[in-house]
Amino acid sequence: MVEVEKKKITLSIPVETNGKLEELAQKYGMTKSGLVNFLVNQVAEAGTIYRQ
């Protein structure tokens, strides 16, 4: 297993957005931080936050 250095952060997001994040994380069997990490990596690979 590869050891990944981690940094704790605090985000202030709307309650509704947090609910969506929790629902998506549960739906795909991920933690909220894992889902955020996945989405950030997807955007980095695509080079944009917009659909192409």
From Swiss-Prot:
Family classification: Belongs to the transcriptional regulatory CopG/NikR family.
UniProt xrefs under SUPFAM superfamilies: Ribbon-helix-helix (SSF47598)
Function: Regulates the plasmid copy number. RepA binds to the repAB promoter thus controlling the synthesis of the plasmid replication initiator protein RepB.
Quaternary structure annotation from Swiss-Prot or TrEMBL: Homodimer.
InterPro entries, per the entry: Arc_rbn_hlx_hlx, Ribbon_hlx_hlx
UniProt-recorded name of the protein: Protein RepA
Superkingdom of the source species: Bacteria
DNA-binding region, residues: 20-40
Signal peptide coordinates: none
Species for this entry: Lactiplantibacillus plantarum
Gene: repA
Single GO term (MF): DNA binding
GO biological process, one term: plasmid maintenance
Keywords (A to Z) from UniProt: DNA-binding, Plasmid, Plasmid copy control, Repressor, Transcription, Transcription regulation
